[in-house]
Amino acid sequence: MSATLPFRDINVHASSTYYAFSSPSSPNAPTLVIDRPSGDLRLNDGKLTGGHRVSSISGILGIVKLRLGMAYAADGARKAVTDELSDSYVIVITKSQPMGRMKGHQIYKVISTEFMPLRERQLTDPDEQTYLTYLKTLIKSGPMYFSYSFDLTNSYQRQAQCDPSQPLWQRADDRFFWNRFVCSSLIDFREGQASGRMSAGPQPAVDAYILPVMFGMMNITSTSVKGNALTFVLITRRSRHRAGTRYMSRGADEQGHVSNFNETEQMVIMNDSASAGLTSFAGDQGFANRNPVDGKETQVLSYVQTRGSVPVFWAEVNNLHYVPTLQIRGIDSAKEAASRHFDEQIRLYGENYLLNLVNQKGREKRVKDAYEEITSLLQSSPVERHEADNKTNERFNVIEPNDKRGWYDHLHYVYFDFHNETKGLKWHRAQLLLDQLKDGLVAGGYFHGIDKPSGGVDVRRKQTAVVRTNCMDCLDRTNVVQSMLGRWTLTRQLIDLGVLKPGESAQDDQSFEHLFRNVWADNADVVSRSYSGTGALKTDFTRTGNRTRAGALQDLNSSITRY
């Protein structure tokens, strides 16, 4: 049984009493109706009449309810408004832009949205307008991506374990299903939960109206290495949990979610004529003259890294000074939260190499010490593991069932004083870190899958470990190190495929190296803007391989802007 995929085309019929959504390419599919002003959902098998406005959209982002408290009438009188009359808006994607293909699946970027009110407001509420403005700004500025046929929220390795007969939204990783909360009304209605009226039971026809959206960075580029055609892909998925901005969100919450958690997946796709970015980067040889790797099998090689704040209770309190006040609660109080966090990380990724890049001196030393203390506390305590949530991708257990080691023995703490090692613009010394991680990188491996002619993926190898990198912000130092690990793994993958010979490196191909550096620097900027409001620091090193004084001056400007 084939899965129900989201509609690629939706028409909206708007009237004073409802919004009706239908797909012109699927005339036999039921129409989704959202009644106004109640917000009740229903499916209609017939044609609705009376719509005053008909428009075409790319998809439904979700339904959001903003609470109204005190409002102002037309005469200026202040008046209380009950929750029953709270404003709700249907958020729709009015414009999207194709930005590349992966294995034949078109990927889109959200360009513009519209907030369609369920209630015509007679009162003006300044708080409501403020919340609405904030939300519109977030959606407008945030890079969001989606596909009608490809799951962007899951790594290739997790996709290989998914049930392809499930609707796209049910396969999505809950952490990276960015619009999951605003889709709650649609999902509840689909699952048969009442929507303001007696439930009619599960409504599988709603599946086609639920479109998972990912927030983060996406780059797909057709390129080559030493004349061998490939598609280079870099995806960073930002977690929807604890997704606040820099000084407003640090550390972990009670559920074990950490600030600025991102999963970055670097992919190489070989022998896939259906994959193509909108731009190619083939160097002097040109795209048309590149030679395919021997064999016709479409191969996917993937390598996943993560980043996230140190999982204890800590904060930086704004005191109007450039350096805010650092506060860290007792480590014992964070044990439950940290264990929840690492339980999930171990289940999902296997061995965790906890790469800590904060300074060993000064104010950052307290964060370093806290991380080391919480890790030691977990490894020395009796294990009380938290049960996996089968509704999320925690069902993907990387650890073998017969592994007899202690649960938290899968955590491997690695410290590298990044600033001290690279001071004086000696950034080449960051390569010393590879010596500390090499054994773990080799043992953890990467994902390698080959498409079967009958469909599905023949998994040749799995990635069984992840490097979880952090600095204070999990931005600038983290970006430099992650790109370095990505390059090292890419070289290993291409050697294993026979594209490179032992002793050669991907960076020996200058055209590809230029592409690689710029894609990773773009990734750094996207992650940084989402968390700090500015582009990343130290990207001159990522883009060129050298730390420059001009880059240092640009970093100073960005630091002032962040403050």
What name fits each language-model region?
Residues 465-484:
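A phosphate-binding catalytic loop at a beta-strand-loop-alpha-helix junction
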Residues 1-460, 489-563:
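Phosphoinositide system proteins, centered on phosphoinositide phosphatases
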